[in-house]
Structure formats: structure tokens, C-alpha cells
């Protein structure tokens, strides 16, 4: 489904569109449901025929043949139920998988700005809890609705052929019940949306607490986390109680309706018998059909709850799918290729969310192969400037270009293919060391991965581990030391081998000896490539081609180490302060 379809189509049309690729299974499910309804309708008629004709006329042979046919019909009914249960759930799972695939693919298109504003736990709830409810609606919803309506309509038709006055009583009561269902469903839907929101909150609290469990234990704040979770859990429990209260009212009304229907049929039927207008056999047949009504009506009640819950999840899914990416490729975007590495910022301004100013009138020209070190006080805009180069965010004013092409004029994929980044906060996937390094180049051979590990000074550490490259790194790499995580991230970049490098405190977690070893590897890697290094340890960037000093979102100074020391400005002050601290 295309993105524009989510913008233009109704929620229900979006939902039904997922049935299309699996319509054969859906049709099979509906056909089996129809056969189940037919068998349920036949039994009262067979009973009536037996009492009217077969037994009074001593047609015992015919009676037992009919009973055998009924047994066979119920065998077929059981088979139909198996198909409904097995293949119906298979249909639901396939719909769920398609929806989840679309949602995950859409999340991949959203920019940093979206994830800055939304918590991971809430997104996890959309991908799991909400989709489960949508799946249940996809499978059971149409099936329950179809069986119920087919049984009710079929039963009414038969009842009108038996005694129209009794059938009229039932027909009058059914619309009243439908009105009650509609009114209560709206209330159920409102409460269900509140429950969904609370589930997302509690999922977020769990994700946050488990991710930060080491921090909580380090501060002995387990009680604080428990209190935060308990508060979220209480809010969830309250919303769930409201939902069950509404469901309880609905169920009570439904059971009352069913009882009134039975009483009304017996009362009117009894009156007709007293006046010689109805016999006992037809009243018994009617009672059997009233019993046949109970199951589909209960299914309708179940459908009302399922629809309310599933629709709430469906609305949340659609809302997320309608979220436009902050960054889009231009319709005529070019594929960036043959990158030399020239970077030009022309009167560049940037503000987060359009109002939090970070960079002001930045002018910068980086020639191909130049190594630029970016230093300055924390919060000055160093990392932000480097995040604009791979277009994680768009500039607010001015322009940023690579090899003369504005980064907004090329595809994001081709742009980022030519840039290698080692971020300050290293993220490793919960997988093996091998797969984490291979992430830099999914098609890499084992020999290439081993060479990248050697150049990143992590090979010996890996081989000393019991499982070598197949060692599991833990959640976010928690089973490795900080330096090991950093070097695995660096190995990814060696493997990717891009023409532009961005190193954001890439050696910050390394000890002095390892840092010294890897610095020469960085120097070798930087040859012939454009390299931007964000550094707080000024001693590591003395050999940079040029050093930029960024403070308060502006380039305040630039030059070589010697030139900036002679200037005796911000850089000289930072360098002198660090030198004194080391001694």
C-alpha cells in the first residue's frame, strides 16, 4: 500500500485492503462459516419434521436415516470448525505480518526528529499489543459477524414460514438490541482507546526501567523505579476496570434481552395455543430457534467488544502510518556517486523544531581529503553540525553540499552510503561480534571482517574470547567493556570504507595505550578521505589539517594547532587547561 493511500483512505478501507492478498483464505473461512450456519439452522427443522411426520406415521427407517444424515452433517460442521480455527488464524497471522511489515518499514523512513519526540516503549506497543488486537479483529470479526447475521436472518425466515406472529415478536426485539449494541459499542471504543494509551505508557515504563536497570542499581533507586511503575500500573488498572465495567453493562443488557425474547415467545406462543392457533410442536420448534439465536447474539456481543478494541488499535496504527517523514527525497533526487569528499556549508543556520537555535551563520569549506578537527565547549553545536552532513536533520537556512550537490538534492540512501560515522554513544545490536562488525558491509567476507577487526585493534580481544567472533555481545553490548564496544564500532567503519568519515569522540572510551595504537590506524584510514573529528581530548587532534573551534553555535576560530595557540584564544585556553589537568 502506498503512503498516499493511508492519507486518503478511511481507517476501515485501509484495514480491508490487507485482506486482498489473502482473499482465497478469507473466502474459504467465510464459506466454512456459512456451512456452519446452515447446519445450525437445519436441526430445528429436522426435529419439527420428525415430530410432525416421521414418528406419528411410524416411519422409523426414514427417521434413523435422517438422524444418520444429521450426524454426518455435524461431522462436516466439525471439519468446518477446524478449517475456521486453523486457516482462519493463518489468515489473521498473515494480515498481522503484512501490517507489521508496513509499520516497521514506515518507521525506517521517519527521521531522527520523530524518534526524538516519541518514546521507544510506545512504538513497541504499536508493533505488538495493538497489532495483536487488529489480528483478532481480522480473523474473528468478519467470521463472527457473518455467522451471526446468517444464522439470525436464516432463522427469522424459517420462523416466518412457521408462525408469522411469533416471528414478528422476535423481529421487533432484534432492532432494539442492535440499537443497544451500537450505543454501547461507542462507549466501549472510547474506553478501549484509553486502555491502549495506558498500555503504551506501561510498556514505555518497562522498557525505560529495564534499559536503565544498571543506573537504578548504581543509585540504589530500585524503589523509585518501582514507584514509577506502580503509578503507571495503577492508571492502567483503573482504565481497564472502566472497560470491564462498560463490558459488564453490555453483557447484562444482552442477557436481559435474551431472557425477554424467550419469555416473549413462550408467552405469545402460549396465548396462541390457548386460542387453538398454534400447536405444541411449532412452539417447541420456535424455542429451538430461539436457542439457536443465543449463540450468534453472544457472538455479536463478542464482536462488539472485539471491534471496539481492534478499532482502537487500528486507529493508532493508521495514525502512525499517516505520520509524514520529516525528511523526504526530492522527486528529482540524484544518486550520489564517485564522491571526492568536498563539503561546503554556506550561511548555514539550524534550529531544532524550528525554534531551538543551535547553529548560526556557519560558513565552511572542506576540501577533499582534508582532516578537520572540531572542538569547543559542550553544547556548542559540534555534533549537530556533523549530523547535518548525512542529513539526519535538514538545515533551517542556508545550504550544505557535498561535491557541489546540495544534500537535499540527492537520495538519503546514496548520501549515507558514502559516509561512515562512529558516534559518541556506541550502539551494538544484541547479536554476535561478527554480525555487529558485518553491519558496516553486509556482503563482507570473513577475511574482510577479520582485517577490519585487526585494523581497529580488537582482533586479539575477540580471539581471546571462548566463542571468538561468534561471542554474544548482550543487550546494547553490555557484555563487553566500553573500549571493546568502541573498537567494534570503529571496525564497522574500516569495513564500510567510506570516502567521508565522521568520528564523534570515537576514541573517548579507549585507554591511553589502545588510543595510541588506534590513532595510527585512523591516520592511515583518513589518507585520501575527508575526515571530521569531534574531540574533547585536544592532544589527539594536533596533526589535523585544520581545527575548528565552535562555541555558541558559531565557528569562532579555525586554523592549525600552532596558529590557534598563537592566537591565544578559546582553543589555546582549552588546550592549556587540559595540559595542566594531565600534569
Show the residue positions of the predicted features:
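Membrane-integrated ABC transporters
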Residues: 1-40, 55-66, 84-92, 99, ...
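Short intracellular "coupling" helices and adjacent cytoplasmic loop segments at the cytosolic face
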Residues: 2-5, 93, 101-133, 204-228, ...
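Transmembrane helix-loop-helix hairpins at lipid-water interfaces of multipass membrane proteins
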Residues: 20, 26-80, 160-165, 276-280
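ABC-type nucleotide-binding domain
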Residues: 329, 336-583
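Cytosolic ends of transmembrane helices, especially the final helix of ABC transmembrane type-1 domains
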Residues: 221, 245, 293-320
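An intracellular "coupling" helix at the cytosolic face of ABC transporter transmembrane type-1 domains
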Residues: 21-24, 112-113, 129-138, 142, ...
Amino acid at each position: 500500500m502506498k503512503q498516499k493511500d493511508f492519507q486518503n483512505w478511511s481507517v476501515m478501507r485501509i484495514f480491508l485492503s490487507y485482506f486482498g492478498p489473502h482473499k482465497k483464505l478469507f473466502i474459504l473461512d467465510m464459506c466454512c462459516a456459512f456451512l456452519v450456519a446452515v447446519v445450525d439452522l437445519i436441526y430445528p427443522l429436522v426435529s419439527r419434521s420428525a415430530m410432525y411426520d416421521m414418528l406419528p406415521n411410524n416411519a422409523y427407517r426414514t427417521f434413523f436415516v435422517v438422524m444418520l444424515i444429521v450426524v454426518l452433517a455435524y461431522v462436516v460442521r466439525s471439519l468446518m470448525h477446524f478449517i475456521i480455527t486453523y486457516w482462519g488464524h493463518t489468515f489473521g497471522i498473515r494480515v498481522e505480518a503484512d501490517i507489521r511489515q508496513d509499520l516497521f518499514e514506515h518507521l525506517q523512513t521517519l527521521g531522527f526528529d520523530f524518534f526524538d519526540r516519541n518514546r521507544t516503549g510506545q512504538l513497541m506497543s504499536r508493533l505488538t499489543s495493538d497489532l495483536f488486537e487488529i489480528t483478532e479483529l481480522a480473523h474473528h470479526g468478519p467470521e463472527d459477524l457473518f455467522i451471526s447475521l446468517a444464522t439470525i436472518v436464516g432463522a427469522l425466515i424459517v420462523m416466518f414460514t412457521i408462525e408469522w406472529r411469533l416471528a414478528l415478536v422476535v423481529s421487533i426485539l432484534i432492532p432494539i438490541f442492535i440499537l443497544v449494541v451500537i450505543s454501547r459499542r461507542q462507549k466501549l471504543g472510547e474506553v478501549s482507546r484509553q486502555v491502549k494509551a495506558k498500555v503504551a505508557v506501561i510498556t514505555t515504563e518497562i522498557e525505560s526501567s529495564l534499559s536503565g536497570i544498571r543506573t537504578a542499581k548504581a543509585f540504589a533507586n530500585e524503589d523509585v523505579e518501582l514507584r514509577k511503575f506502580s503509578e503507571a500500573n495503577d492508571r492502567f488498572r483503573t482504565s481497564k476496570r472502566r472497560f470491564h465495567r462498560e463490558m459488564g453493562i453490555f453483557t447484562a443488557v444482552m442477557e436481559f434481552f435474551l431472557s425477554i425474547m424467550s419469555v416473549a415467545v413462550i408467552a405469545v406462543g402460549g396465548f396462541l395455543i390457548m386460542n387453538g392457533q398454534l400447536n405444541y410442536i411449532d412452539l417447541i420448534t420456535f424455542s429451538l430457534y430461539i436457542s439457536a439465536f443465543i449463540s450468534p447474539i453472544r457472538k455479536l456481543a463478542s464482536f462488539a467488544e472485539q471491534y471496539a478494541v481492534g478499532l482502537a488499535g487500528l486507529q493508532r496504527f493508521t495514525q502512525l502510518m499517516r505520520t509524514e517523514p520529516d525528511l523526504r527525497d526530492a522527486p528529482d533526487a540524484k544518486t550520489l556517486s564517485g564522491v571526492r569528499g568536498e563539503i561546503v556549508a554556506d550561511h548555514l543556520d539550524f534550529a531544532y523544531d524550528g525554534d531551538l537555535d543551535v547553529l548560526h551563520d556557519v560558513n565552511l569549506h572542506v576540501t577533499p581529503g582534508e582532516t578537520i578537527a572540531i572542538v569547543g565547549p559542550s553544547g556548542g553545536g559540534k555534533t549537530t553540525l556533523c549530523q547535518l552532513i548525512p542529513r539526519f536533520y535538514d538545515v533551517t537556512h542556508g545550504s550544505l553540499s557535498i561535491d557541489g550537490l546540495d544534500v537535499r538534492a540527492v537520495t538519503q540512501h546514496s548520501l549515507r552510503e558514502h559516509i561512515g560515522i562512529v558516534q559518541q554513544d556506541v550502539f551494538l545490536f544484541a547479536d554476535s561480534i561478527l554480525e555487529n562488525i558485518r553491519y558496516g558491509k553486509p556482503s563482507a567476507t570473513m577475511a574482510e571482517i577479520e582485517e577490519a577487526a585487526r585494523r581497529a585493534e580488537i582482533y586479539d580481544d575477540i580471539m581471546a574470547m571462548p566463542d571468538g567472533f561468534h561471542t554474544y555481545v548482550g543487550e546494547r553490548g553490555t557484555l563487553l567493556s566500553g573500549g571493546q564496544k568502541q573498537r567494534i564500532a570503529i571496525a564497522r567503519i574500516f569495513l564500510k570504507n567510506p570516502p567521508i568519515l565522521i568520528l564523534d569522540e570515537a576514541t573517548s572510551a579507549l585507554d591511553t595505550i589502545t588510543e595510541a595504537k588506534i590513532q595510527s590506524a585512523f591516520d592511515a584510514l583518513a589518507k585520501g578521505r575527508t575526515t571530521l573529528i569531534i574531540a574533547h581530548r585536544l592532544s589527539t587532534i594536533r596533526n589535523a589539517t585544520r581545527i575548528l573551534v565552535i562555541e555558541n553555535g558559531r565557528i569562532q576560530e579555525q586554523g592549525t594547532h600552532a596558529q590557534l595557540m598563537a592566537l591565544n584564544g578559546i582553543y589555546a585556553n582549552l588546550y592549556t587547561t587540559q595540559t595542566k589537568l594531565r600534569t
